[in-house]
Amino acid sequence: MRAFRIAYDGTGFRGFQRQPHGETVENALFEALSSLGVAFEDGRPPGYAAAGRTDAGVSARAQTVAFEAPAWLLPRALNGELPASVRAWAAADVGDAFHATHDATARAYRYFLYAPEPSADTTRARAACARLSGSHDFHNFTPDDRGTERTLSMRLRRQGPFLVVDCRAGGFARQLVRRLVAAVAAVARGERPLSFLGRALDDDPLSGADGIAAAPPEPLLLADVVYPGVEFTVDDRAAESARTVFATRRRQRLADARVAGALSPPE
């Protein structure tokens, strides 16, 4: 078995998990493996599992997949068949019993929240993160009916006009990070009092205008997945390919932002 670290720009995909309609990261990965002649059983490589399922528009730096891979399959070889927006960059040989989903002890997400001062208060945002950290039933922060009890930590730092929010837990329910960030943003902007978070963490469901909608997916990144005892070896050529591809995309988006800023008619 071999585990691979995968980075991808999720903006052009309908999520990570394979589906029959619409391009997903997993679809692209399986097509690449098929082109390379990797064996499949029941539509996937033997032993295949992934660390998590990111939603449409969400990106990743450390998505992790593992399966029975031939000895010659290095990240650089995988990149030769993957689209440019998906880059393998490290790998680790793991035991036959390794499972990329179940063996992960922690997952870390990072959200880049556009929240310039003074419209968003950093002190209020930090207080909101502290209130949401710990062990809670987050049933009001996810559409899931089960698996809503989680223990997590939230931290943030200001980076210019952005609040960078880091969320870490053993696992996350659907939309949990994005709804947590939306709640933090509402407190930071003065749209909700800090006491609202206590209500959101109570047993009673929130309804109507009190409901918490998910923040947009595009600013969210799966930053890390932790596997104790597993040491990933960076493929230098593959990592350089990833840096080049994503640096180019960054420059293009900076240019796109300048164009968007110039669209308003003159006053």
From Swiss-Prot:
It catalyses: uridine(38/39/40) in tRNA = pseudouridine(38/39/40) in tRNA. GO terms for molecular function: RNA binding; tRNA pseudouridine(38-40) synthase activity. One of its GO terms (biological process) is tRNA pseudouridine synthesis. Keywords: Isomerase, tRNA processing. Substrate binds at residue 109. The keyword Zinc-finger does not apply. It is an enzyme of class 5 (isomerase). Its EC number is 5.4.99.12. The keyword Isomerase applies. The active site is at 55 (nucleophile). PANTHER family: PSEUDOURIDYLATE SYNTHASE, TRNA PSEUDOURIDINE SYNTHASE-LIKE 1. Belongs to the tRNA pseudouridine synthase TruA family. Formation of pseudouridine at positions 38, 39 and 40 in the anticodon stem and loop of transfer RNAs. This is tRNA pseudouridine synthase A.
